[in-house]
Amino acid sequence: MALVIGGSGFVGSFLIKELHNFKVENLDKNPSPFFDNITTKGDIRNLDEIKIHKGTESIVLLAAEHRDDVSPTSLYYDVNVQGTKNVLQAMDNAGVKNIIFTSSVAIYGLNKTNPDENHLEDPFNHYGKSKWQAEEVI
């Protein structure tokens, strides 16, 4: 079984649809407009709300604050960095070893030509900085 964390959004909804041949659960602070029957409400800022059921083999971590108008800006770090730490702790508690983590091209800065993992980090906003810090946590 896979647990998609943050699967109620745009990317998560399409991912869950593609995983229709697998047993999947969704954990999100928002309800899912398409997969309400497999969605549990939870906020990764609170370790106690990260419910990983027995039989879960992999976590797909999509949850993030990403909009440009997030206020206060500390939410980027509370969700993207501390939330990642909380997910890793919940995984450790449940004995889950596999994580698929989605980062962002925003960690490489503006006007980069096809950056990959070998490019130097040069985040230009709080979202990029927080995703870079989350990568460092993992």
Spans of features found by a protein language model:
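Short alpha-helix in the Rossmann-fold core of NAD(P)-dependent oxidoreductases
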Residues: Y77-T84, I100, S130-K131
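SDR active-site strand-loop-helix element
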Residues: I5, L27, I59-A63, I99-V105
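N-terminal Rossmann NAD(P)H-binding glycine-rich loop of SDR-like oxidoreductase domains
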Residues: M1-H20
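Conserved glycine-rich Rossmann-like NAD(P)H-binding loop of the short-chain dehydrogenase/reductase
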Residues: F22-P33
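Rossmann-fold cofactor-recognition segment
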Residues: P33-N46
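Active-site Tyr-X1-5-Lys
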Residues: F124-I138
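NAD(P)H-binding glycine-rich loop region in Rossmannoid oxidoreductase-like domains
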Residues: I44-V79, A90-N93, Y108-K112
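Conserved Rossmann-fold NAD(P)-dependent oxidoreductase catalytic core, especially the SDR/UDP-sugar
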Residues: N86-H126
